[in-house]
């Protein structure tokens, strides 16, 4: 059976090898719900402008609904010679209602049809990813109260830097995920423009109503230029970029918790339901889910690179190259969705190892910066205080003690501006209590943030 897309200009049969090479039904069949919804809206518009009768519209609509049911149940066979989901649906319609079905494609091309289908699929998928991001934010937030009294080392260059409250870590990831949500919302605005009505490349001479179709499909507006619309895949690339950044954030979190779960760090216990063992080493409990999250992020970023290379150097307007946008698009969203679905239960089920963390929290001179700022607050220039505290830390290292255990006489030997009140800011607990600034790990600031995020996520 020849595809409905082949006109009378063709005098030769399609080579079977081309049918297999050019098909996209193996991956674009997942667009069928959007394709049928778009076709019903298009047919309704054709009825409104007088290009279909009321009876013709109802017959097309009802038959498309029947075809949708068959696709839901997997009853409609897929054939390479019909190329894509659009032709499968149209041919099924024609097989059932004949010439009336042939009227559906009036004032429409597969160029604007696939663009619209893809926009609707991305729009729905963005909303689903957004909901998963909220769930992951809620998972991090749910840890904050129980972990509030735990002090962790913050790292720069993977070296211990300053002490922070554990909830400060969780809030940091909530902020990253919120930026991801903001990017989704911003991207969605550009996705949510209806392509239907630009036809192949130049528009149509027929009296269609593009706004009517856009409204029926819940688009915010219509695209402005037929040439641009026919060629545009910015919305595919941009949405995949958003997925790539989400994947990057998840990869960073996974890497951190992989490190934290090692004997060397011994900060966290990953739920065993999300770990696997070794085929030879019986003692192993490996954080495979987190490792796969770190690894799968590369697939999402690779999809973005594929799309960027796909669209470069394409002249206006539509080119068949653009058919290849869907495998990387679908894979990027599918992979990101899978990563998020597993991230939330891991975050909720993990346990910080309080005793192990507390046993080593005073190592690494995490209170050195607080000591420097104590000196600055007493009038010492920052660079002078910075140099002096470095010398104090060096002395403590030589003696093998913490800053809070260093004798006052040693401090005063290095600076006569230091008195016994210095011990009020030494030690990680005192250092935490000394913080004041907005956005810091100060307990009051952290509680403010927890309260704000509790309210925000309740309304998300």
UniProtKB/Swiss-Prot annotation:
Pathway where it operates: Amino-acid biosynthesis; L-arginine biosynthesis; L-arginine from L-ornithine and carbamoyl phosphate: step 3/3
Q: Which Pfam families match?
A: ASL_C2 (PF14698), Lyase_1 (PF00206)
Q: Which domain of life is it from?
A: Bacteria
Report the top EC class in one word.
lyase
* Catalytic activity, reaction form: 2-(N(omega)-L-arginino)succinate = fumarate + L-arginine
Give the matching CDD domains: Argininosuccinate_lyase
Under the heading HAMAP family, the entry gives: Arg_succ_lyase (MF_00006)
Protein name listed in UniProt: Argininosuccinate lyase
- Species per Swiss-Prot/TrEMBL record: Rhodopirellula baltica (strain DSM 10527 / NCIMB 13988 / SH1)
